[in-house]
Structure formats: structure tokens, C-alpha cells
A protein has these predicted regions:
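Short, low-complexity, Pro/Ser/Thr/Gly-rich segments in the mature regions of secreted, periplasmic
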Residues: 239-253
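Short acidic/histidine-rich active-site segments
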Residues: 195-202
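Catalytic phosphate/nucleotide-handling subdomain of diverse soluble enzymes
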Residues: 208-210
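Bacterial N-terminal signal peptides
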Residues: 5-15
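Acidic/histidine-rich, metal-coordinating catalytic segments
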Residues: 203, 227
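Hydrophobic alpha-helical bundle signature of multipass membrane enzymes
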Residues: 20-192, 213-219, 223, 229, ...
Length: 253
């Protein structure tokens, strides 16, 4: 419970409302996943049978009080909350105040990648597990908002995987911890009843596709270099390139 309490205390410093960050591409410019990922499994398939088994498994996992608290926290659709969550495996606080360049790369990078979910969600309009079974989610406060939104792919899973991809680019030494947390972040959506396992499984390559596309943005590449320079200065006390000395001066104020 200490871990959850730590996260919740950090969240008090986060903004209450989800941000709408500037993005490097529009949703129309993002790769259309309908053209490059499989459709959700048919209801008579072995894959869907596995989805049902995983949904039943997820309901048993809700009995774990610490995991349930983490799931409640992970469900909050807010980039500041996501930054709080991933600050732990990243190893530094990710915030506009303490790490402005990392924060900007993180929120705008993840905010761009997650746009890739919009078209396939509307196209497939897959029914969510809690809707299909007419049962409650663990995170009951989400139910009305999610009821008419497509289940495939999982927006939360895309966000979590995108967070790990962007932050591992800044701090490669934290790769294992970042992707372990991202994996659990997606799995938590199965446990709460928001998504089928196949939604979550498709969302990880979906995020990777968005991340590859993100690399083609010169503005993102420049912001990533600034974020790396800030990270190196904060961790090692050096500036990798003199053109980024202004970052150090701003941090020293």
C-alpha cells in the first residue's frame, strides 16, 4: 500500500483536468490501423474464447486490494496522472515544474501516438466485456462514459505503451522497469472489465506503429533532444551539447 499511497500523494500535484496537448500529427494523418492490424476476433473463434477466460480471470484479480487501488488510479484519463505513474519506473519526477522539457516531449509525444486509436475504435465499435455481460466494472465511475465507445483497441494500453516508448528513449537504462509497468497498465484494463485481452494485445503494436511515425516529425526529434539534454544534466550534471545550455539555466532558476 505504500507504493499506492506514494502515487496518490504525487497526484495531488497534478492538474485535475486532462490536458489536450499540442500534437505533431492529426488523427487523420496517423496510420490507419484498420489497414494494418487484424480485426477483433470473431465471437466463435478460439481467440474470443480466450478473451472470455481472461475476463473471468480478471474478475478474480479484483480481490487484491493493492492491485485494485492501482487499477483505480490507472483508469484516470489524464496525462498528468500518467506522468505521475511513469515517474516511478523512469526514475525522475515528470512535471511541468521540475522537468519541463521531458514533460513536453512526454505529453506531446504520447498525445500524438494515442490519436491512432480513434479511427479503429469507431470503425469496429466492439462491445466491451462489462457491456456484453451486463455487469459492473471495478471502476464503476467509468461505465457510462465508456459504454458507447468501441473497445478495440484499448486507448489506455496505447497510452501506457507509448509512455514507455517515449521515456525509454530518454532514459534507456529504465527500459525494463518502464515496459513492465506499461504491461501491467494494459493488463489492468482487462481486470477492471473495460477491455478484452485481444484489445490490449493489439494496442501494443498499435502504439509502436504510432511511435515509429512520430520519429518522422522534425519538431518531435528536436524536442526529444532537449528532453535528453535535460535528463543528462539532472542525472549527471553535464550538458551534452552547448546549444542546450539555456535549458540548464532555466532549471537553475
Amino acid at each position: 500500500m505504500k507504493y499506492i499511497s506514494f502515487l496518490l500523494s504525487l497526484c495531488l500535484c497534478a492538474s485535475v483536468f486532462a490536458q489536450n496537448p499540442q500534437t505533431y500529427f492529426t488523427k487523420e494523418e496517423m496510420t490507419n490501423l484498420v489497414n494494418c492490424l487484424p480485426a477483433p476476433p470473431d465471437s466463435g473463434s478460439l481467440e474470443f474464447a480466450n478473451d472470455i477466460l481472461r475476463y473471468m480471470w480478471g474478475k478474480t484479480m479484483r480481490q487484491d486490494a493493492e492491485r485494485a487501488a492501482e487499477i483505480e488510479h490507472d483508469a484516470i484519463w489524464n496525462l498528468d496522472t500518467l506522468a505521475v505513474i511513469f515517474s516511478v519506473p523512469f526514475g525522475l519526477e515528470i512535471s511541468q515544474e521540475k522537468t519541463p522539457e521531458i514533460y513536453k516531449a512526454f505529453t506531446q509525444g504520447v498525445g500524438t501516438i494515442e490519436l491512432i486509436r480513434i479511427i479503429p475504435k469507431a470503425y469496429y465499435n466492439r462491445k466491451r466485456p462489462y457491456v456484453m455481460y451486463n455487469e459492473h466494472m471495478l471502476t464503476t465511475w467509468e461505465e457510462d462514459e465508456l459504454r458507447n465507445e468501441g473497445s478495440y483497441p484499448s486507448g489506455h494500453t496505447i497510452r501506457g505503451w507509448a509512455a514507455a516508448l517515449v521515456l525509454a528513449e530518454i532514459n534507456p537504462a529504465a527500459t525494463t522497469e518502464l515496459f513492465a509497468r506499461a504491461g501491467r497498465y494494459g493488463e489492468n484494463r482487462v481486470i477492471t472489465g473495460a477491455h478484452w485481452q485481444s484489445d490490449v494485445d493489439a494496442s501494443r503494436p498499435a502504439a509502436s506503429i504510432g511511435y515509429v511515425q512520430l520519429q518522422s516529425s522534425p519538431a518531435y526529434r528536436e524536442q526529444m533532444e532537449r528532453a535528453r539534454a535535460e535528463f543528462v544534466y539532472l542525472v549527471y550534471g553535464t550538458v551534452p551539447d552547448k546549444k542546450y545550455k539555456a535549458i540548464v539555466k532555466n532549471l537553475a532558476r
